[in-house]
Amino acid sequence: MTDNNKYRDVEIRAPRGNKLTAKSWLTEAPLRMLMNNLDPQVAENPKELVVYGGIGRAARNWACYDKIVETLTRLEDDETLLVQSGKPVGVFKTHSNAPRVLIANSNLVPHWANWEHFNELDAKGLAMYGQMTAGSWIYIGSQGIVQGTYETFVEAGRQHYGGSLKGKWVLTAGLGGMGGAQPLAATLAGACSLNIECQQSRIDFRLETRYVDEQAKDLDDALARIAKYTAEGKAISIALHGNAAEVLPELVKRGVRPDMVTDQTSAHDPLNGYLPVGWTWEQYRDRAQTEPAAVVKAAKQSMAVHVQAMLDFQKQGIPTFDYGNNIRQMAKEEGVANAFDFPGFVPAYIRPLFCRGVGPFRWAALSGEAEDIYKTDAKVKELIPDDAHLHRWLDMARERISFQGLPARICWVGLGLRAKLGLAFNEMVRSGELSAPIVIGRDHLDSGSVSSPNRETESMRDGSDAVSDWPLLNALLNTASGATWVSLHHGGGVGMGFSQHSGMVIVCDGTDEAAARIARVLTNDPGTGVMRHADAGYDIAVDCAKEQGLDLPMITG
């Protein structure tokens, strides 16, 4: 049966305050975060349930959304809701320390794990692409990836430019839910940036939310602005309406030399996320319905041109890296044999953090009050007094990042500190310092929760890039530890067949029971990241495991 229930002309907004609409905060929290994912301030295309990342949805269709909401409002604290690719399929008796929701999205048996088969199922209403935090109900807008992008740019500055990006500029493309973080991250890291985007509506959204500073009228204007701002040492972000597969080759032809090149277009999904050269967006969307194979071919041909230009920049000695959208794979399939000559961002800049379980720890204020986030910011500084880099991030985040939907914060911390912060937040709820409970979650892009050979697990030391036992173990352990909701997805970030990953969210409601769950979950979750990297032979991870007292029988036993 074809699914015709993916569009509804409605605006969704999560309830605010401390009055429950469900039976407890353990069910109110997933309800509010589901709704928050579809807030028009948060989602890319909420009327079609699309949160970010091409077609990353929060629910399979509107009938499923309605039934999820209805079920969460009646769910008891000894029951668990099962969600299968965005559809609520069952409620079962469990116990009070079990997750209230268990989610599996987009998972396919490996032989069938490709876009063609998935799209057939999607068209029949039998599947949903959950991306990473879209279908797991913990997306917080572009802030969710700002710090990770910032950390990447800062580390690139350390490695290539002596620790400073002042007077430098980044060339990139894509201003969607993930890519939209790039201009602000570059600015916070001290660099100018030129951000190419083919949809004017996305540029408008990033201008409105202050993620990008200016829009140039054409390429010449953009380059003039870049030249002016870099000469003045100013970190200003510039958007340019255009197609990266046209603009990058033109820049190569002109001999323009950026200081860093990357990309965050939705190249992972050629049918829905990458505009072929010479096409309008309307043509692209229409032909995706009538000629999907031709659309995919045209998109991948344009990606090949795009990647070739990136390779041309790299040949000039310009730091060039993939930012996790699988564009190198798409280009390789289209004949660019050396597409992987430039690295992904994780092996190039982020893996040492993952070895210590450091990753995108995030929290949201269910109250809707910004002041609750500012109080937690202060608590983080109090509990981690000597980390000047982290303090600078929090100060910049408060000054520059506009909240989208429920106020939230992201803060990269690792094993040991996550549990410490979570317990402190729970105590703040208990004492009344915070006006309502907090939810703590993370991106699936974390140290122990994803297997993705072209992104997070690219070039693992022991060659275990494609082993996907690790996110399964992470999901199982978070379930056993008492996370409030746990998710297990396929295909996020890099597309069907290229990743498996898991997520968790835990509620801080101020109770003793919550404190026990928080201590378990926020220790065990990052602990799996240290375990995974120690098992792969990374000395940093082995040392961290020993320092933190992890029991790893083959390593610390």
From Swiss-Prot:
Enzyme class: lyase
Gene Ontology CC entries for this record: cytoplasm
GO molecular function per UniProt: urocanate hydratase activity
Cofactor note: Binds 1 NAD(+) per subunit.
Entry coiled-coil feature ranges: none
Binding-site positions, NAD(+): 53-54, 131, 177-179, 197, 202, 243-244, 264-268, 274-275, 323, 493
NCBIfam families: hutU (TIGR01228), PRK05414.1 (NF003820)
Family: Belongs to the urocanase family.
PANTHER family according to UniProt: UROCANATE HYDRATASE
Protein's name in the database: Urocanate hydratase
Organism: Pseudomonas putida (strain W619)
Lineage of producing organism: Bacteria, Pseudomonadati, Pseudomonadota, Gammaproteobacteria, Pseudomonadales
